[in-house]
UniProtKB/Swiss-Prot annotation:
Gene designation: SKG1
Key words of the record: Cell membrane, Cell wall biogenesis/degradation, Membrane, Signal-anchor, Transmembrane, Transmembrane helix
Any GO BP annotation: fungal-type cell wall organization
Designated name of the protein: Suppressor of lethality of KEX2 GAS1 double null mutant protein 1
Membrane-topology descriptor: Single-pass type III membrane protein
Transmembrane segments: 9-29
Annotated localization: Cell membrane; Bud membrane
Sequence ranges on the Extracellular membrane side: 1-8
Annotated source species: Vanderwaltozyma polyspora (strain ATCC 22028 / DSM 70294 / BCRC 21397 / CBS 2163 / NBRC 10782 / NRRL Y-8283 / UCD 57-17) (Kluyveromyces polysporus)
Disulfide cross-links: none
Length: 326
């Protein structure tokens, strides 16, 4: 009786656990197989990108092809046959309907783009081989007269070319359009020379022209220089001073008493006060600071910014006095 109970409990617990482990193992193996396949695809693509001197040969990368997608292969064959009938290499439709793009697995966007490039490359090779077999003599003569076809590197496929014309507007094109224009243009100069010429023709150090304001549109621009700062208007004593040009940043070398004495001498000489002059103690420019103007020769350096409005010591004293309780 005890043995039958233990067997029943073991079967009830062990069988579901065993089935779950088997199912989990199957999913794990499938996931590992998928990871391995994706690692191989990424390694092939990275190897092709880092090869600078070789064209991306999709025949050497079978992992990039989706063998499980039979509908896509049939669509590619139809596309190539249509190209052969039309005889135009640039009429390859890239975008397909959703019904024609059904796949068993999810394909990323960059791999769909690579597959489209591989289809275009295969179609071009088939057309070239058929043209060579149909009229080989004409092809040989044309190839001898034509310039040598340049070798397309990986950078030519990945990096789009910039138009060398300065006046033309640079338009952003997709990777497929740039690859198509680069791969089909055999008479174009080498990529290195074209890149150098484009870099030399572009002006990277200039700025866009400044937009004129509405107030200055109808006003003629005069070629006159404007002063960097506006000085004070000449004071009453400008005609008495030896230098009429006032320098507001210069330390005055004359005291107020000297200016008053000059005004008195002017009055005594003429017998009447000069027109526009007033004898007062407010005449002239007086620098009120902590230094004495009369001993200016003994002062090594004066604080030009400490005057009657910015008397730091006086303001500090008044501020401290205002904090005291009254």
């Amino acid at each position: 009786m005890v043995a039958s109970n233990s067997v029943a409990v073991g079967c009830a617990v062990g069988i579901p656990v065993g089935v779950g482990l088997i199912i989990a193992g199957c999913f794990w193996l499938r996931l590992q197989r998928r990871f391995k396949r994706e690692d191989e695809q990424d390694a092939d693509l990275q190897r092709a990108v880092f090869d600078e001197d070789a064209y991306i040969n999709f025949e050497s990368m079978p992992t990039l092809r989706n063998n499980n997608n039979n509908d896509e292969d049939n669509n590619d064959d139809k596309r190539i046959k249509k190209i052969e009938e039309n005889g135009n290499e640039n009429t390859i439709p890239i975008n397909d309907n959703k019904e024609q793009r059904k796949s068993k697995y999810f394909v990323p966007a960059y791999r769909r783009k690579i597959n489209a490039l591989s289809v275009r490359y295969d179609g071009q090779q088939n057309i070239e081989m058929q043209g060579f077999g149909a009229n080989s003599s004409k092809v040989s003569l044309d190839s001898s007269n034509a310039p040598p076809k340049r070798v397309i590197s990986v950078y030519d496929q990945m990096v789009p070319f910039v138009d060398g014309d300065k006046n033309s507007v640079i338009q952003n094109t997709e990777l497929l359009e740039s690859n198509d224009s680069v791969g089909n243009d055999s008479t174009r100069p080498s990529s290195q020379a074209n890149l150098i010429s484009n870099l030399n023709s572009n002006d990277f150090g200039s700025y866009y022209p400044r937009k004129e304001s509405f107030s200055s549109i109808n006003i003629p621009h005069l070629n006159t220089s404007s002063p960097s700062f506006t000085t004070r208007p000449s004071s009453v004593n400008s005609m008495i001073r030896p230098n009429s040009t006032d320098n507001i940043f210069d330390t005055p070398r004359k005291s107020n008493s000297d200016i008053v004495s000059i005004n008195k001498d002017q009055v005594n000489r003429t017998g009447s006060p000069v027109k526009g002059t007033v004898i007062s103690e407010n005449m002239g420019y007086k620098l009120k600071n902590n230094y004495n103007i009369e001993n200016s020769n003994e002062i090594a350096e004066e604080d030009q910014y400490e005057n009657e409005f910015t008397n730091y010591s006086q303001n500090k004293k008044e501020f401290i006095d205002s904090l005291r309780p009254k």
